[in-house]
Amino acid sequence: MRILFTGGSGTAGRHAVAYLAERGHRVLNVDKVALGHPGVSDRLADITDAGQMYDIFGAYAGYDELEPGTGVPTFDAVVHFAAVPRLLMTSDNECYRVNTLGTYNVIDAAVKFGVRKIIFASSETTYGICFADGERKPEYLPIDEDHPVVPEDSYAMSKVVNEVTARSFQRRSGFDIYGLRINNVIEPHEYARDFPGYVAGPDLRRRNIFAYIDARDLGQMVECCLNTDGLGFEIFNVSNDDHSVDLTTQALVERYYAGVPVAEMDSTETFYANKKAKKMLGFAPKHSWRTELSG
């Protein structure tokens, strides 16, 4: 596939871009800084500038695309990850502006250029727990895509707005637009660096409801979306299968979630339900912090 990927130089994006490139996809990375990954083209741009987005969608991805003499090819898909990645990096209103306006511009350009598959990064923060003022408990466990989204911060608000924006574009266009509520992304080097501390101090993972997503498995999730057509608008949680701490489901519930309704769950099953992605997309996360630390 010929894929336009925004934000491919970021923490989550660079692993997804590498995964897609290794799987044979042609990827144009659009970001404020170049990725420099072999076989991936880079284009520097600002997603909040609609003119720059329209220009990129109508431009060649590399010199080789000049050779056929048939004009600029249409992208097969857009993967939109570019954003202010969390709160407290800039002012609240700037975080909200960049994330909402940028997403509008990318999806608008994609639809107007006839790109029929759009995948965008939403967030675990939409559920209102991660960046809450004080402790917020889920209404039930595990959290699935039907759980209420009531965020308190500008970052999570922007992600909820982006889901509404995407739904509106999908209804008008009929294209496939899938949103990924991505949990805390873990890069391979972070297992040895951080997870012993999480085992010793599980409180550190409470705001992420003890869940995580391996950056390489996130790449697989993106490709699962690329390979699945005809779903219209859908939202998917993205997480690995197990808790990010060395406590059982029962122990975590007793310590942190007293009074929260809990469905029947396995002893290490994530509180951030990924069953929808498995059923509808064939998502099959391969990594676990336990095997990463042991081998």
Label the model's feature ranges.
Residues 122, 163-188:
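Conserved beta-loop-beta element that borders a ligand/cofactor-binding pocket
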Residues 105-152:
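Conserved Rossmann-fold NAD(P)-dependent oxidoreductase catalytic core, especially the SDR/UDP-sugar
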Residues 145-152, 179-213:
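A conserved pocket-lining segment of Rossmann-fold NAD(P)-dependent short-chain dehydrogenase/reductase
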Residues 97, 133-174:
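Catalytic helix-loop patch of NAD(P)-dependent Rossmann-fold dehydrogenases
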Residues 3-23:
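N-terminal Rossmann NAD(P)H-binding glycine-rich loop of SDR-like oxidoreductase domains
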Residues 36, 47-98:
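NAD(P)H-binding glycine-rich loop region in Rossmannoid oxidoreductase-like domains
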Residues 172-176, 185-200, 224-235:
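Glycine/proline-rich active-site loop of Rossmann-fold NAD(P)-dependent oxidoreductases
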Residues 216-295:
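C-terminal substrate-binding subdomain of Rossmann-fold SDR/epimerase-dehydratase oxidoreductases
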